Amino acid sequence: MAAVVIGRNEGARLEPSLQSVHAAGLRAVYVDSGSADKSPALATKLEVPLVELDCSRPFSAGRARNEGVREILRRWPETAYVVFLDGDCTLDAAFPAAAAATLDEYANCAIVTGHLAERYPDASIYNRLCSIEWASPAGIVETMSSLGGIMTIRVSAFQSVHGFNEQAIAGEEPDLGVRLGLAGYTMIKIDRPMATHDAHMFSFRQWWIRAVRGGHALAHGYAEHREGRRELLSALFWGLALPAAILALIWPTRGFSLLLVAGYGIIGWRVYWHYLRSGRTSSDAWLVSRFNIYSRFAHMVGVLRYCANRLRGRFHIIEYK
């Protein structure tokens, strides 16, 4: 078993990330995507094998992880399981062994995840949103497209679907999950802590860029696998069609079309009650409901950006930090 840690300008977050892998007793490689800080030097100082991606090709998390697996198999060809960890996360020391035991037990299981926690959930409302987003029940994961970037994966399964799509600048994890599901594999979330994440998100602009990336991922998932149709249609309706209709009909309806804005209030109310019934506090439910509405517009921007990128044939990473 070994770990691939990926990063780009992670700063002070990288050292505890690499140290957490060492504390878990794992061999590891660090893959750097053109950092302008001292991340590569730090990895070298900690004696973690370093892979620096060639900047002549576009960077992507998928490309970094693929390169990391190649380096692991070059160094330790007997490796059966790989832990993927982002450089802004620290790994729980007991998780790799628990994940390996699950993969040993279930031959058709390709991926094992656990509970991801936000390190500073109260540092900002944006960190709080991430903390709420990470929460999900343990068990067999029915929706393979819900895969995130932190996981333990069976190397043979990873290779059977040719790894990550290196061209995907967002949504590369759901893309991998869908392809593994189509190949007959399953994903299990075990009821154990997996890692701690540091979102380091303190502005609406950062949140917006991250949400735009989510819309880009939605469009990519539908274009590649016809996955996420409902979510994509929702972004198209609430983020484009309804606002366009409201504006277009203002004059003919003498302003009555503005009443359609109430639709956003209705979906916000539904989201609020959903989270309240699931056990969240009223303040958390209210926070999620507001940003759920904002996300419809950000997702639409991401969808349009994906379409423009596809027409140009060029994709570049979307960074919020």
Residue locations for each model-derived region?
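Conserved donor NDP-sugar-binding/catalytic core segment of glycosyltransferases
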Residues: 90-125
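A conserved acidic beta->alpha catalytic loop
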Residues: 20, 32-41, 55, 89-90
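Short, well-formed alpha-helical segments that are part of the catalytic scaffolds
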Residues: 6-24
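Membrane-embedded multi-pass helical conduit in multi-pass membrane proteins
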Residues: 239-311
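Catalytic donor/gating beta->alpha subdomain of glycosyltransferases that bind UDP-sugars
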Residues: 165-228
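A recurrent flexible, glycine/aromatic-enriched loop bordering the glycosyltransferase active site
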Residues: 118-119, 135-153, 169, 175, ...
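Short beta-strand-to-loop acidic/aromatic patch adjacent to the donor-nucleotide binding site
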Residues: 76-90
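Glycine-rich, basic loop-to-helix element that forms the pyrophosphate-binding segment
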Residues: 55-74
